[in-house]
Swiss-Prot record:
It comes from the Eukaryota. Allows the formation of correctly charged Gln-tRNA(Gln) through the transamidation of misacylated Glu-tRNA(Gln) in chloroplasts and mitochondria. The reaction takes place in the presence of glutamine and ATP through an activated gamma-phospho-Glu-tRNA(Gln). It comes from Zea mays. GO terms for cellular component: chloroplast stroma; glutamyl-tRNA(Gln) amidotransferase complex; mitochondrion. Disulfide bonds: none annotated. NCBIfam families: gatA. Pfam families: Amidase. It is found in: Mitochondrion; Plastid, Chloroplast stroma. GO terms for biological process: glutaminyl-tRNAGln biosynthesis via transamidation; mitochondrial translation. InterPro entries: Amidase, Amidase_CS, Amidase_dom, AS_sf, GatA. This is Glutamyl-tRNA(Gln) amidotransferase subunit A, chloroplastic/mitochondrial. The lineage of its organism: Eukaryota, Viridiplantae, Streptophyta, Embryophyta, Tracheophyta.
Length: 543
């Protein structure tokens, strides 16, 4: 267990090394604001804390809280389509049972997540609840078990509200790739929420649920968090068990989480993280109580980030990045400087190599992982004259276009004669990316960049241009290749929609240093006094 905060300072070990060639960051701009809603702007507050306190005091019941969220979900879901399945009856029963236990004085009834409504991305297995992966090939599939992350949430008292929409098997950046529906962005329903965890991000943004789980293979938590104006966390590879997560690219897949505040996100991570005997890649490192290390706004010093060294990656602010995004990130960097940190530009020359390497490696692993969906072991079965036809027709009818394309790309990269030219070289690039991040993180406590090169774009804008869509992952894939933790916190707005479109700041750190990211993210979030990240969909009086 790490030591408690002392004198309310950020606990980051700072290594003094010889000064490398780099440029001091300078920016006159401040964090961009926009008239986001009619609500008064101010720091994000913890919904989890509020729910817990109201249950303990008897001010509210779990049934009341569940009814409130279900009511909001029913009003907004026809527009957003965030959920593939809503378990409303089960949620109401669980809430009533929680109230009964509290009333009878059972001391363990109010767990850390008691009464907290959670959305679960539909590529995480949930017992006796549809788990489709966003694919027709698993339509109607109901697992007999919970994914480890889901089980731990339930054990902490959380109520699973339903399964959120996603790009099929996590392959996409818009949630348009779902076999069932297209999710829209709560900030502008003509725009995408990002992906592949777009349903989870949109649901938290619209307050359809308190928090949600997602998965992140190349940015699938962080990019939609940026597009929807919520907090998104991709933990270190191995920090959270992958048992029960439908495999896309097993060396890259990570279970992540969304919240409307850093505190809520930290609370969820503490619950779901930790070693799991069902996942050999899960880490046995001790899991801190991340939320307890966060300092309330009234206790913050005037320069709470004194001594913290932050590197802003030069390659993420150049060609191909929207000017409004660059301005927001530079404004966020200036804000971090005002809080006492030293912000300098740092170059990662291998940064641009990560994107092609990622798509080769991820597609190669997907071509193997998805071979299990053959119409016999998993998936809907079609009538056929022989076994080969059964395999072919089941997969042709069950998989969508993007999934088929990535399977073909991965099979090609692994085939004889091309393995060395593609897969082997991509693995070599991955090693290079890991080393470049390791070197940079020996000089800086945290690295920052945009979470995406643009804000949310129009539905249909890139669906027929896969290269343009893939290029949108440039900011996030390197973190997965390196296995590092990353946190996205809303930092500003760009023009678009009726009230502006949110932009997210990505913070990256060393392995298993989620606590550092959460502490910096919390301080950053709590000192953004002039911004509100509640979407216009939830106008005053409709919350």
């Amino acid at each position: 267990m790490p030591p408690p905060l002392q004198a309310h300072r950020l606990l980051i070990s700072h290594r003094r090394l010889p000064t490398p060639a780099r440029r001091r960051f300078t920016a006159a701009s401040s964090v961009q604001s926009a008239p986001a809603t009619t609500l008064a702007p101010g720091p994000a507050t913890s919904s989890i804390l509020s729910i817990r306190e109201s249950l303990l005091s008897g001010e509210r019941t779990a049934a009341d809280i569940t009814s409130e969220y279900l009511s909001r979900l029913r009003r907004t879901e026809p527009t957003l389509r965030s959920f593939i399945h809503v378990a409303d009856a089960a949620a109401e029963r669980e809430a009533e049972e929680l109230d009964r236990r509290i009333a009878s004085g059972e001391k363990d009834a109010v767990g850390p997540l008691a009464g907290v409504l959670v959305g679960v991305k539909d590529n995480l297995c949930t017992a006796n609840m549809p788990s489709t992966g966003g694919s027709r090939i698993l339509d109607g599939y109901r697992p007999a078990y919970d994914a480890t992350a889901v089980r731990r949430l339930r054990e902490a008292g959380a109520i699973v509200l339903g399964k959120t929409n996603l790009d099929e098997f996590g392959m996409g950046s818009t949630t348009e790739g779902s076999a069932f529906q297209v999710t829209t962005n709560p900030w502008d329903d003509s725009r995408v929420p990002g992906g592949s965890s777009g349903g989870s991000a949109a649901a938290v943004s619209a307050r359809q649920c308190v928090v949600s789980l997602g998965s992140d293979t190349g940015g699938s938590v962080r990019q939609p968090a940026s597009f929807c104006g919520v907090v998104g966390l991709k933990p270190t590879y191995g920090r959270v068990s992958r048992f029960g997560l439908m495999a896309y690219a097993s060396s890259l897949d990570v279970v992540g989480c969304f919240g409307s505040s850093v505190f809520d996100t930290a609370t969820i991570l503490s619950v779901v993280a930790g070693h799991d005997k069902m996942d050999a890649t899960s880490s046995s490192q001790v899991v801190p109580e991340y939320a307890s290390e966060l300092v309330s706004l009234d206790l913050l010093e005037s320069k709470p980030l004194n001594g913290v060294r932050i590197g802003i990656i030069q390659e993420t602010l150049g060609e191909g990045v929207a000017s409004g995004v660059v301005s927001s990130i530079k404004g966020a960097a200036s804000h971090l400087e005002q809080l006492g940190s030293v912000v300098e530009e740092v170059s990662l020359p291998s940064f641009s190599l990560g994107l092609p390497a990622y798509y080769i490696l991820a597609s190669s692993e997907a071509s193997s992982n998805l071979s299990r969906y053959d119409g016999i072991r998993y998936g809907g079965q079609v009538s056929a004259d022989d076994l080969n036809e059964l395999y072919g027709e089941s997969r042709a009818n069950g998989f969508g276009h993007e999934v088929k394309m990535r399977i073909l790309m991965g099979t090609y990269a692994l085939s004889a004669g091309y393995y060395d030219a593609y897969y082997k070289r991509a693995q070599q690039v991955r090693t290079l990316v890991k080393q470049s991040f390791k070197d940079a993180l020996e000089r800086y406590d945290i690295l920052i960049s945009p979470a995406a090169p643009s804000a949310a774009y129009k539905i249909g804008e890139k669906i027929n241009d896969p290269l343009a869509m893939y290029a949108g992952d440039i900011m996030t894939v390197n973190v997965n290749l390196a296995g590092l933790p990353a946190l996205v916190v809303p930092c500003g707005f760009v023009e678009g929609g009726a009230a502006g479109l949110p932009v997210g700041l990505q913070m990256m750190g060393s392995p298993f240093c989620e606590g550092n990211l959460l502490r910096v993210g919390h301080i950053f979030e709590q000192t953004l006094q002039n911004l509100s990240f509640v979407p216009p969909l939830l106008a005053e009086g409709q919350l």
